[in-house]
Structures are given as C-alpha cells and as structure tokens.
Amino acid sequence: MASFWSGTVADFLRTPMSEITGSLAMAQIRHFRVSAAQQLHAWEVTISMLRPALAAIPQAETWHILLEYPMLRLGKRPDVILLTHSAILVLEIKARSSMHTAADRRQVEDYAIDLYDFHAGSRAHPIIPILVAENAVDAVPDMPLILNMGVMSPLDTSANALPALLIEVTRHTDTVAGKLDADAWLRAPYRPVPTIIDAACMLYAKHNVAEIRAARSDSYNLNLTTTAILQEIAWARTAGQRIILFVTGIPGAGKTLCGLNTIFGVEDAGRGTYLTGNPTLIHVLREALTRDAVDLGAQRSDARRKMLSVIQALPKFRDHYVSHPAEAPPESVVVVDEAQRCWSANWAIGKTRDKAVPLTRSEPAYLLEIMARRSGFCAMVCLVGSGQEIHAGEGGLAEWGNALRDAALHGIEWHVRAAPDLLKVADLRQRLGALDNLQSLPPLHLNVAIRHIRSTLAAFGVDRVLEGDASGASELARGMGELPFWLTRDLMATRKWLRGHARGLRRAGLLASSGAARLRSEGLGAELPHMDASSVAHWFLDRFPDDVRASDALEVVATEFSCQGLELDYVGLCWDADFIREPGRREWRVRTFRGTKWQVPQQAEVIANQVNTYRVLLTRARYDTVVFVPNGDEDDGTRNPVIYNDIVAFLRACGARDLDDSYLDRCPESNEGLGGILAQSVLELPT
C-alpha cells in the first residue's frame, strides 16, 4: 500500500510545504473519506521538525522518506518512515507534547513490529521505532545494542534532539547492518493479517475492504468464498428469491471475516445484521466499533445505539419476532454466526418452558420463518464451524435441514447453497440431508487457516493432537519447521514469556477450560465472566498496565465461552486434569469435577464438547501458544502428578517445545537476544 507522500529526502527538502500537505490531505480523503483539516497542523509540525533534522545530515539526501504509511489499522498510520542506507526508522511525532507515554511507545513499537512481520522488505534490516515528543526535555537517549535485523526497543527524543539522535542511530546501523535498497523496499509486498477486531472496524467504515481481502497470498480461498457469497446474494436479489448459504471452515480460516464482509463491506448488500449467540463476540465487536466511531468524531451514545442493530444477539432477535408474529425484520441480509450451535427443538422447548417467550420449535425453524415474512428477496448466510460445538443442546446442521424441509412442505421455498462437506459428513448431526433447490458450491468451504501468522497448517496440527495422533502431529511439525506450541510447568515462566513477546500492541492472555477446576490451586481461580459486557470489553480491548482488567495483566483467565470467535496474539493455555492421557489409549480421556473428585462422563455429546473446548483453546493464538501444565501434588488425589506428566509427555511427542531457561533469559524487553526471538516469528512472505 502506498504512503500518502513518498520521495527522497532531497525531494522532501525542496518541495513546498503546501504541496506536501495538499497531497497528504487528498490521500486522507481518498483513503478514509474524512476531512484532513484537523490534521493540517500536525503535518506542518512534522515537516517543520524533520526538515532541519534531515538537512543536518549530508548523507540523508539519498535516504527515502514516507509520510503517513497505512498499516491496515483503521485511521492509524506511522507519521514517518525513514529508509536510511542501512535501517528502517519509524517515527511517531506528538505535536505540542512534552511527555513520552507508555501508550505512545507501544503504538510506535507496534508499527515497527507490523513492518517486521508483514513487510517482506523489512526482514533483513534493523527497524528502530522513535517517539518524538515535540517539547520534551532535550536529550539524546543512550544508544542500545543495535542488531543487524529485528525490532529495537523504542527511543524517546524531542524536536530539538532529533538531529543528534538520527546521526547517532545512523552511525550505529551503518556499522552493523547491510545496505538497504530503498527502491526494492518500496516494491516489496506488505501483506498484513488484521485481527477480527481491526477487520470489523475497517469493514464497517467501508475502508480498505480490497486490502483486507488481498491481505495474504494464501487468502485466495477466502477471496473465492467471499466472491461466491456475494454473487449468490446478487442473483437472489435480482430474481426476488430467498436464498440461504452454508459456509464451512476450519478454525481460523476466516468465516467471521466472510460474514462481516457480507454485512459491512459491500455497498449494494442491502441492510443487514450479524446474528450471534456468542455474548463475548457481541460485547467486544460492539464496543470496538463504538470506540472507533468515537475516535472518528461520533457521539458515544449515538454510536452505541447504532451498533445495537449492526451486531445483534441471536436470542433477542429470535424472541422479539416470535413474540411479534406479524412483524417482518427490516434486514434483507442476515449472517448467522456458528449456525451449527442453534438449539434443537427438544432443547429449545426445555430451556424456554418457563421463560417470557417459550419456544415450541428449533431455532433454525424460527429463523427461517422470521426471514420468510419479508416479501421477495432475503438472504441468510450461515457460518458453520468445524469442531466448534461446546454447549449441550446444539442441534447441528441436521436441524437446519429438517427446518428447510418443513418450510418447503408449508410452501416456503428457499434456494440452498452449501459447501460439499455438509452433504457427506460422517457425523449425522452435521449433515443437511436431501433438499430441493440445493446446489453444492465448493468455494463455500474455507480450508486454509489465515489466523495464524506463521503457518496455515497450525490448525491441522491441533487436529492431530486432539485425535491422539502423536506421530502425525510430529510429522506435521517437521514439515512446518516446528509447531507454534511451547511447554512449561512454571506459571511464572508462562507470564514472563508472554510479557516478553507481546510487544507493542500485541495482546497476550491466559486461557483455560471452564472445567479446569483444580487450577485454583495454582492461583488461577479468577475467571472472566463472559456474560458481563463491561468485563469482556476491558479484557479484550484495554491495555495493561493502564488497566489491570486487561488480558495482558495475565491475572484473569478466559474460558472457551469467553474466547470462541475471538483471538489473541500470544496465548498462555493452562491445562488441567479435565482432559488427560491414559496409557495404552489413543483417545483423550474427558473428566468433570464434582464435589471432591474427578468423574468420567459417558455421554457422547459431553465428551465431544470437551474435545472441542480444547480445540477452541488451542486455536486462539495468532502467533504462539505456551501450554502451562501444573506439576500436581502427590498429597492431593485430585492433582496426581503422574496424570500431568503424561499430558506433558504426549504434547512433547507431538512436537511441542520445552520453554527452557536459556530461552526465558531472552524474554525481557532489552535488545539482548531480540534478533533471535524475532527470527523465530519469521513469516515467509512471497516476493
């Protein structure tokens, strides 16, 4: 993606300021559809500050300078990127400021890490984030050890001290680093992988939708699926027909992104809403979208009210229209998140018998009937997660098939498009069955994981682990180079590792199964209340140390109910004795804690849900997962050390690596060893 203004430093020094700011303003309007008036002063300060600083360095004339380089984080761009002869300098300039805040340091460091992770031309050179507070005390900071590649810790400076700092940085980098070809850097691909939250904000504001779709070369599958959905919806709209599409995918393949793009990202998609029964996803997306709208000038109360219709709780949507049978929804396009989790008829009847709105049919039957109240065109896009069922009473795709057949018997016709695997899957709960007007569309299956930054195969490694296939997981690990999983028996080591790696705005957090009852003995009894909107928003969106309620405080543990559908950059997975290995048995043993002892459930649904719980937990990380397994206690029958040791032995056999002391010594935020740490997070980007 091109910066708002780019040229050599010589060009920068001789181009009139008005011409540069005019180019910046036009780019601001073109990219973000908002006026740049409030930015003009900041740009003028930046230009006025940089010109004398760069003019004082004779060799700087042949450097390259980029102003306002979009980083696929809505409205957030580093002010300046300087390409010297040997290094990449990322400058964030705070006009009129006299303070270097922790938040500002995280911001500029995050920009630098984004370049390292996602820009192919930035991997072989030092990247140095510099925070310039215009009116700060004039001092050149002590120069840390600068390596020949990797992201250095942020340097603080002022406007007056900037020239001296640039000279000192250049002296060091020219000594240790190779030559940087600015033209090659400008041609190199920048392929970021936005988080779900970033993508939602961008799609809702209709910014950079094309860049999101093309973010990775391995997102071809995602692009095919998105295109297929939009083409089928366009056909149904033109024909005035009802259509329902079933989109399947492995964990982290982009189902949520497809759904959000259907609702937010297309000009002619019609009025739509995203329905989910996942309260955490509702809380986090609504709050993130609200905060973003406020940052762009909206009133918070207005933004919050608007988000109520954009992201809706499926149970409230359902109950409203069940209790108002003559009312049709205004939305012509509805995305149903995790459609396989909709309630079966028996479960719906039992769960709502004493509620204000008692149900007599399955949730799929109600949703189809509600949308069919609209005359003419309507579309439903059902997102189906493979191995994501973690609740009792989830009816699977068979309930949707039954509801569609029943609708046809009552004269309500739906055109059905489904991924091929839903027609032949072995699990009868997840098979649609025979339907009129059914077409199999291969693009509706997402089989390439894009959540994980380093490998598209991480989800398949998790599958082998949960199948009890240590040799298969180990073979896959060798093919990947290594699995993105680490092992430790030390909770403090887990926290140290997470804090050392979650630099910039990368987010870390502790996860555990809701059945991990004996982790309390390790001090992990504080569990994130997933139904509490405020607690969930603080955990996923705020930052430690500014807010101790944030995930990266590493104090409160999120369960599968809190994190399903969302993600973290780095995960500390706390593994308890609710999911264990037994000698001579390939399958995992599922246990539940009752009273004072562990019990072994026999119900197939309970067992399957617990396997899926660990699938959810093992696939939340965008980078790496550290698995903490307690040592246990010989004097406590509920924490048998042998059981925990067997878990560790199996995970080690699968390819998980031990978090040894030598590696932990490199975790603090000094530059010592950062090159080695960051080298392990290399994303092989195509050239």
Give the location of each predicted region.
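Accessory nucleic-acid engagement/destabilization modules that flank
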Residues: 1-192
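Conserved lysine of the Walker
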Residues: 255
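Conserved RecA-like ASCE ATPase "motif II neighborhood" in helicase/translocase motors
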Residues: 302-371, 555-559
